[in-house]
A protein has these predicted regions:
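Charged (Asp/Glu and Lys/Arg) segments that form or flank catalytic channels of large polymer-
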Residues: 40, 47-50, 57-88, 92
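Internal maturation/activation junctions in enzymes
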Residues: 13-59, 155-162, 180-229
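Structural signature of the thiamine diphosphate
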Residues: 2-29, 69-72, 76-79, 84-85
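Alpha/propeptide regions of enzymes that mature by internal proteolysis
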Residues: 1-8, 56-71, 78, 145, ...
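Short, well-ordered loop/turn elements at secondary-structure boundaries
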Residues: 4, 14-16, 49, 62-68, ...
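Secondary-structure capping and boundary motifs in well-ordered enzyme cores
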Residues: 109-117, 143, 166-177, 196-207, ...
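Catalytic or ion-translocation cores adjacent to nucleophile or general acid/base/metal-coordination motifs
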Residues: 1, 238-257
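Function-dense linear segments that define catalytic or interfacial modules
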Residues: 71-188, 254-256
Length: 257
């Protein structure tokens, strides 16, 4: 299944897909799936997914922090998904809907419930530059507005799967990512770059909430994320990404808009 999906997805002329698989803290077999000495027969299939261990309590995280470093040094994985912090949110007034988070998309940018689709658009900072190498703030603003508008429409569209539709209608989950944000770090001072990120976040939240309220009468559970890197597609300033859940696993399908 996972080998077939990339043939159906095009990103800048290249087939692309990714999958993220989770396990609990005490699953020793899972930890060693990408170890060549333990599982040599998996050498040619181990890159079909990214593997991460879920930490549901501070104690889980403390345990993982002691176990994983030598495994990561050897095979680069498994990673860690701190589900405890994901459910707490970033403020004292975190949306209570976050308590239902079970997983993420394949890059772990967007928190997801079971059977929830990830709806992500990326504004590419490096595509919002003036000829002299400075940031074109009007173009960046327009990119954020367009990404917010596009994802809000997608979030409010009904789905053809009852379980996914129930979660979509409750959350209207939207994610707008500012990709290639390393450009701002290299171009601006730390204070200027911090101000830029805060301004983009506030802009995206304002427009996403305005659009989803106008369309569906409800605010989105999530809004933004930022990436230090980011692939730059040759044909567009933003990407759309829709993740379809298959049981407890999530498959990312990314395409150009």
């Amino acid at each position: 299944l996972y080998n077939t999906i990339p043939r159906c997805v095009m990103d800048g002329g290249t087939g692309r897909s990714s999958a993220l698989v989770f396990s609990g803290v005490d699953d020793e077999e899972f930890r060693l799936l990408k170890n060549d000495d333990t599982n040599p027969e998996r050498r040619f299939v181990r890159n079909m997914s990214n593997n991460s261990i879920c930490a549901d309590t501070p104690e889980d995280y403390a345990k993982i922090a002691k176990i994983l470093p030598p495994l990561i040094k050897e095979a680069g994985e498994p990673g860690v998904f701190n589900r405890f912090l994901a459910r707490c949110g970033m403020s004292r007034h975190a949306d209570p809907r976050l308590k239902r988070v079970r997983g993420t998309n394949a890059c772990s940018e967007v928190l997801l419930e079971g059977w929830e689709f990830c709806n992500l658009a990326s504004a590419i900072l490096q595509r919002c530059m003036n000829p002299d190498g400075t940031i074109d703030y009007n173009k960046l603003r327009n990119a954020c507005m367009l990404a917010a508008f596009y994802t809000a429409i997608v979030a409010c569209n009904p789905l053809n799967e009852a379980r996914a539709e129930a979660v979509r209608a409750e959350n209207l989950r939207v994610a707008v990512s500012l990709d290639a944000s390393f450009v701002g770090y290299e171009t601006l001072s730390n204070q200027e770059f911090g101000t830029l990120l805060k301004s983009c976040k506030e802009l995206i939240i304002t427009y996403v909430d305005a659009y989803t309220m106008a369309i569906a009468g409800k605010k989105s559970v999530t809004h933004t994320c930022f990436k230090p890197g980011g692939k730059i597609p040759p044909l567009a300033d933003s990407l759309s990404s829709i993740n379809g859940p298959i049981c407890s696993q999530y498959v990312e399908l990314r395409r150009i808009i």
